[in-house]
A protein has these predicted regions:
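Acidic, glycine-rich two-metal-ion catalytic cores of nucleic acid-processing enzymes
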Residues: 120-210
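N-terminal leader/targeting and assembly helices and adjacent pre-domain segments
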Residues: 1-148, 208-210
Length: 210
């Protein structure tokens, strides 16, 4: 599964109300993603504070400890929100572990990069994670409820990737895969089939289901 290497892109955090508010998802889903992003933001701000404190003390980062910290805290948050990452949404457990490993790897490799432990980075991670989780759970819920078709939607602005622009309004059977550049995806933000960073990071596309 491809991992979103946020620090390798020129991504700038956008206020959550604007970031999600401009998307064509339902108002209830916008609110859910905003609340989810706020919780993820809090988690990573705490993480970055702990990492910064370790560095100030001259300690070498305990990679396993911090990866486990992210994984445990993230799963606790999902449980609090009633999101089942074991049976209903099994991809989440894999995603969380790999995302945690990638975030800590970046911090280990770039100890002098202040952005690695910044509030802006926490927001960028939160925005991407909230959309990834939102798109995945909406897809799985649509499958479970008997929906049979899905339509790819974009923001229709200059920030939309060319490979995503080509998919605007495309409707296909729900279990078929969208051809997105060099990759295949079940829905926007889907990395379960190996989609690369260039097709997922900062993406605000969404699917509708019928």
């Amino acid at each position: 599964m491809a991992i979103q290497k946020f620090d390798e892109l020129n991504l700038i955090a956008i206020p959550y109300e604007q970031y999600f508010g401009e998307m064509g998802i339902s108002e209830a889903e916008k609110r859910r993603r905003i609340e989810f992003a706020e919780s993820i933001d809090d988690l990573f701000i705490l993480l970055f504070m702990l990492i910064s404190a370790d560095r100030e003390l001259g300690n070498e980062l305990d990679v396993n400890y911090y990866v486990d910290f992210i994984e445990r805290s993230y799963k606790d948050m999902l449980e609090e929100k009633g999101i089942d990452y074991t049976e209903k949404y099994p991809w989440l457990a894999v995603h969380i572990r790999q995302m945690a490993e990638e975030i800590i790897r970046q911090n280990v490799e770039k100890p002098d990069d202040e952005w690695q432990t910044s509030e802006d980075r926490a927001m960028v991670i939160a925005e991407n994670e909230a959309n990834s989780i939102g798109e995945y759970t909406e897809f799985q819920d649509a499958v479970d409820s008997g929906k049979t078709r899905k339509t790819w939607n974009t923001m229709l602005d200059k920030r939309v990737r060319h490979t995503h622009e080509e998919l605007e309004s495309l409707t296909i059977p729900i279990m078929e895969r969208f051809k997105v550049g060099a990759y295949e995806m079940y829905q926007p933000k889907d990395t379960s089939l190996g989609a690369g960073l260039e097709e997922v990071a900062g993406c605000r596309c969404w699917c509708t289901y019928t």
